[in-house]
Amino acid sequence: MLLESHDFAGGTSSRATKLVHGGVRYLAQGNIALVREALHERTTLLHNAPHLAQPLAFVMPSYKIWETPFYGVGLKMYDALAGKAGLGPTEFLSRSETLACLPTARPDGLKGGVKYWDGQFDDARLALALARTAASRGALLVNYCGVTGLVHEDGKLKGLTCRDSETGRNF
């Protein structure tokens, strides 16, 4: 059963970043296990929903001399962790290459940049595709019916209560 208080994919799903990243931010924290897990999940999504997810290049401009090698080396480590699941190699970019990729970047003080690959997906379409798949396998989907409480018996969850926001009826 799927209960949604508003439109399907209209809440948190609609406010997502639309990125299916392999955990590059976790690399900065030194959390290698989480990077590996995120890379695995990214690969799974790109494989299972190629019509909804695709590789996307990112370019980080560098305005300080140390930024290109610093971020570039970290992103090369990201590539190494991705292994065969990598979406493209990290590239060190010259000033002119960076401006070609980012024509609206501030040219004053630009030293170069780094280009790396992650993923992007259509979150609303994915949520709807998953809901349709669940329905085709017998799940009940109800929108405009929010959960209002949980029913416990003998310390165990036994059910829930909900309210139909169109009729005002409680279930």
List where the protein language model places each region:
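Glycine-rich FAD pyrophosphate-binding loop
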Residues: 1-16
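Conserved beta-strand edge residues that scaffold enzyme active sites
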Residues: 6-7, 59, 148-149
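Short, conserved phosphate-binding/catalytic loop or strand-edge motifs used
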Residues: 16-20, 156-159
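Dinucleotide-binding Rossmann-like beta1-alpha1 core, especially the glycine-rich loop
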Residues: 18-101
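Short linear elements at protein peripheries
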Residues: 79-109, 113-129
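Helical element adjacent to the flavin cofactor pocket in flavoenzyme catalytic cores
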Residues: 114-171
